[in-house]
Amino acid sequence: MHKNGITHRDLKPENVLYDNVFNLKIADFGFAAPIIGRDGSGSCKTKLGTESYMAPEIHLRKPYNGASVDLFACGIILFITMTQHPPFTKAVQDDPFYRLLMANRADLFWKAHSKNKPEGFFSEDFKNLITSMLAFDPSQRPSMADIKAHAWYKGEVVTLDDIQAEFA
């Protein structure tokens, strides 16, 4: 999508679908825009999307990079996929969990989220990836190429046969 010059701006679990052989499909492009912004400035400016998946720069009504805000939302989706709950309510100063990330206290963020989880539930690679994807400063967030090169992404891959066996 980004390679085609499009930013989604409303990525959330409800908009991530799978076909019958578990290929990922993205749905609902109602808020999509050119990744360089509608005015060609290189930035998007409108506050659109589902608030709990919005990057902080959107909440702050700053011009934003479409790819960066989409990857921020992907970090939230990935966290939910792993834990079955979001990492925070909204990426704003008032949210205690997001405030920890803003203050560079990822250690406390992960300590809080590790309560009631088995020891080692979150791998260091997973924590590193999610922390970077949810960075307050969009220039500190990884690109898709960075994510694909990340150790967590390159880890063990579940095969289609594994998935189908799980649902059999």
Model-derived features: positions:
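Conserved activation segment of eukaryotic-like protein kinases, specifically the C-terminal portion
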Residues: K45-I58
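Conserved end of the kinase activation segment
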Residues: I58-S68
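Terminal C-lobe "cap" of eukaryotic-type protein kinase domains
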Residues: A135-Q140, M144-L160
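Catalytic-loop of the protein kinase fold
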Residues: H2-Y18
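Hydrophobic anchor on a C-lobe helix of Hanks-type protein kinase catalytic domains
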Residues: T81-M82
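C-terminal lobe of the eukaryotic/viral protein kinase catalytic domain
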Residues: P86-A135
